[in-house]
Amino acid sequence: MKKVCFVLVLILTLFMLCSCGRYVKSYSATILITSCQGNEASMEFDTFKGTNNFKLRRDGIAEHTLDFEASLAEGEMNVYIGVDGEKELLLTVKGGESYDETITLDDKYDNEKTIYIILETIDKCVDGDFEFEYN
């Protein structure tokens, strides 16, 4: 009986560890500063290569928009929106470009209280600043 209970606990623990996150963070960076609180997130770095994500939540009445500010000196970064383990490309930021936009989200995100913003490099990125607000 003890062995059966031990095996069940082990299987349950393994299942919980494997199903915790839907999106993976894997990167190398120098001077990386991140913040994620409620419906706002930001990331600033000197150099960055890899993938990072932020979980944004909104409360109350929704405008279904994403305020987005970004600048990048060198490299190329894809910005995705993720829901339920799937991701959709919002835009690509290339070196020398900067954005200050409000993006109206598709109808399929109307009922979503939580979204993920996924930042994924194509090339090594230098001197980047990204800010998001989910409304």
Task: Mark where each language-model region is.
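Short proline/glycine-enriched turn/loop motifs at strand-loop junctions of beta-rich domains
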Residues: 61, 71-76, 123-125
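Transition segment at domain starts
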Residues: 21-57
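C-terminal motif of bacterial Sec signal peptides marking the signal peptidase cleavage site
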Residues: 15-19
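Edge beta-strands of jelly-roll/beta-sandwich modules across compartments, strongly enriched
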Residues: 120-135
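Exposed aromatic-hydrophobic patches
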Residues: 55-56, 100-107
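Extended extracellular/luminal ectodomain segments enriched in beta-structured repeat modules
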Residues: 59-66, 110-112
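Positively charged n-region of N-terminal signal peptides that target proteins for export
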Residues: 1-8
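Short, surface-exposed beta-strand/strand-loop-strand elements in extracellular ectodomains
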Residues: 74-91, 132-134
